Amino acid sequence: MKKATIALVALAFAAFTAQAQTTSANIVGYSKTSHAIGYTISAMQFDGGENGPTAVYGDQLPAGSKIYAWDGSGYSIATYGNVFVPGQGLVTKWNSEPSLAAGSSYWVETASAVDSIVSGSVNTAATVTNSIAAGYSLVSYPYPVERTIADLELSPTAGDKVYIWDGSGYSIITYGNVFVPGQGLVTQWNNPTAVVGVGQGFWYETSTPQTWVVNKPF
């Protein structure tokens, strides 16, 4: 359960080279999430190279914590706790390394309240294109920026839904006919100002496969 995701991204130039008219930079960012006891839907919005739970979270989460990575039909589950390592005995570590690659979203379960920090390189591509399958997808906005539903640049069809987890239940936003005074019925999201925070993932439900093209917002 997420008490708050702090919409904080540090944009620090880790490398900067200028020769004639050529400039290159690596932008490094981080997001901080405060987990209460229970479940959070988190998002990986940075490229950190290695992308398993050990690389992403290390020992930040308490023993007994779990990560559930959705593959479209089920979960790969990683647990942080005592694992027997030959020659070392019991070692506290993650027992598996499902991919938490940039652009992915996943559940985090914690047995006690804790803050976690996720960091890595910020995607600076002008656009990012992702495919959304029919059914339910656990997705992430590809840039570490807070967005309203209207700003996500989704390409919805009537009946599509966004599910935002608030720690105890879902806020459900539906795309369809909405009465707008002075305009009548308009096809749009019924809560376009709902917010998806930095480091926060969400469920997307659609009956039609879609291509999601996002333009860099900064």
Which ranges hold each PLM region?
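Sec-dependent, cleavable N-terminal signal peptides
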Residues: 1-21
